[in-house]
Amino acid sequence: MRLTQLSGVCLMGVAMLAHADDDWLVVKRAAVAARQQPLTGTYLHQMNGSLETFRIVRGGTGDTIQEKRTSLDGPSREIIRKGLELTCYAPDAKSLSAAKISAMRLFPAILPDDIGNIAQSYTLKRSGKDRVAQRDCNWMDLKPRDSKRYLLRLCVEPVSNLPLKVITQNAAGDAVEQFTFTEIELQGPKDKSAFRPQYKQNYVLRSANAPQMTLDADAPSEVSGMPSGFKLLRAVQRSLPGQAERTIRHMVFSDGLVMLSLFIEPQTDGRAERAVNLHGAVNMATAVQGDYLVTLVGDLPEPTMLAMIRNLKITLKP
């Protein structure tokens, strides 16, 4: 009898592990579908008490993927993706600035390309079923293992694995940012003119021919003070335009979900330590360390960013 009970417990444990692995596979597929699934739809973006509406179309496969999102309210702007290239378009400079800000969070592609290390800092749990844009979806909650990060909730359509709704919540359970499809068809437009820009003023956010950031000889030799789980992905050093003697070191860290950029540049004037919200869940913190101005940008809570910028210790290579 005891052996039978023990066998039953073991089988239950194996089943639970298999179910957990299946859930992580769903999230991995959701990260791919969020960038590659052909679609035509409309979505809402809610943050900081404001609401924006965008129309999005996407078609093609692999390097030929094209995507265009157009604002339906607020400043007129377009964000167009062709393969790896990402460009903002607008009728005037003010609207172009708004387009650059909107491009910080390109729903439904909220998850990073590679989520291989995500389980170190987050747990995954199914939290029920829902219906979004007349489609069934399953809630997948990525809960941080500490209070320094946001909770990310995704409602994933079970056939395509496309996230139909994404909510970012703080430790108190309040929604910091929310994206929701109101209309969605899982096919792209047949007419290629749907991907053409309407406006002439543009700004290239990411060039298809841009060199990839790698760990180089000028990267900092040591960075401490990051929350657990963050690893250095890549680093680069650049000179400022027209100021060859002034260089900026840029490093990108990730915990498998959050992408965190660290900028180090020579300090030229006194700036107070501060943390500010840039856009939705994206915050920025700055502080002076010796002769350098240090800036952090990422989708972490403002208190976390401020604590990090205070505790960050950077040792530069000679």
Describe the role of every protein-language-model region.
Residues 1-7:
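Bacterial N-terminal signal peptides that target proteins for export
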Residues 88-110:
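Acidic/charged, solvent-exposed loop-and-adjacent secondary-structure segments enriched in E/D, K/R, S/T
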Residues 204-290, 303-307:
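Short, solvent-exposed recognition patches
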Residues 162, 169, 173-192, 296-318:
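Surface-exposed amphipathic alpha-helical segments
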Residues 180, 185, 192-212:
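Pro/Ala/Gly-rich low-complexity, hydrophilic intrinsically disordered segments
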Residues 20-92, 120-158, 162-168:
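N-terminal mature ectodomain segment of secretory-pathway/periplasmic proteins
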